[in-house]
Amino acid sequence: MKNIYLQPDVNGFVNEKFLTVAISDEVRKTKLNSYIPAGANTHKVYSGKPEEYALYFISLMKNSSQLNANFNKVVQSYSSTGNLVEVERIGLFSVNPLTCPGIDSGKLFLPEVNIVEGVRLYEELILREGKLPEVNGVIFI
């Protein structure tokens, strides 16, 4: 798919239809393609098709960034050592720039880069946990 279709509008929002195609294309390249995690039916991932994962990821994006490519928020959370830390969340997938080594945080505002990194991080999480994260939960990727 051409990146021109993923360009956000004036307010930073990306068309959901084009997002579905771009995410499906990215999922096809991963181990998530045809993978059915435990409890996936509750998130409408019945057969592990890339399109089903795309709709699942879009529901996550709607919850976190409202499909806004310019999304940028600093959240406070507790680390594993119990310290309060501030973490920046960027782009459609609300990605933490620290989890994307080698990528400039400014590039995470580009939908095509954010989709690649977001799918990569969720692939690692889903394969490690063996289940899909809850859509209404706070997910730190």
Task: Specify the residue positions occupied by each region the protein language model found.
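Catalytic glycan-binding domains that act on GlcNAc-containing polysaccharides
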Residues: 3-141
